[in-house]
Amino acid sequence: MQVLVASRNKKKLAELQRVLAAANVEGIELLSLADVPEYPETPETGATFEANARIKALDGVRNAGLPTVADDSGLAVDALNGMPGVLSARWCGAHGEDAENNRLLLAQLSDVPDDRRGARFVSSCVLAVPAEIADAADLEPEVAVTGEWEGRILRAEQGTNGFGYDPLFEPAEAPGQSSAELTPERKDELSHRGKALQQLVPALRVLAQSAQ
């Protein structure tokens, strides 16, 4: 069963592959947006992570005709009243500029003491399935899940793994380390996206079994 991951980020594709392998789910071939004919993507105008993930997942079903997993993730900082939130990827105004986003966040928190630098990563994932495939598998056409990862914002970047705000995020479970210093397997276990993807495993297992 081919399943589209609505992203061109190879690390996100690899993350879901590791989650499926750890759960012994076989029979799923993951494709990225680079593997299917290009299609016009609907702007992510949702006010929540789940709304944006749903937009991307339904785009995949409508244009590629495949079951599609999409996520929208971001950072919620207590001292910034939950921002950057859904604006995380374009916090500095340019989508995908990780270094600029990180510099801006550090500047905004420069006067915030360590005990008030609490933050969490949030990931909402949506699995959308074409109606005929959902009916055959006795599966809901949409499955939405959310994972959160608590921690705090460091005062300087640490580590070279991961992407986005990972070098600035100190997980509650790993004091003194950033999430960019964790192994991929440890990050899958702890992270917001890993937690969300693990909740999708039962539905993906049903899809795989329905194709056998």
UniProtKB/Swiss-Prot annotation:
Q: How does it assemble?
A: Homodimer.
> Which family, according to the similarity comment?
Belongs to the HAM1 NTPase family.
Give the residues the record marks as binding Mg(2+).
72
* Alphabetical keyword list: Hydrolase, Magnesium, Metal-binding, Nucleotide metabolism, Nucleotide-binding
Catalytic-site annotation from UniProt: 72
Quote the cofactor binding remark: Binds 1 Mg(2+) ion per subunit.
Protein name, UniProt field: dITP/XTP pyrophosphatase
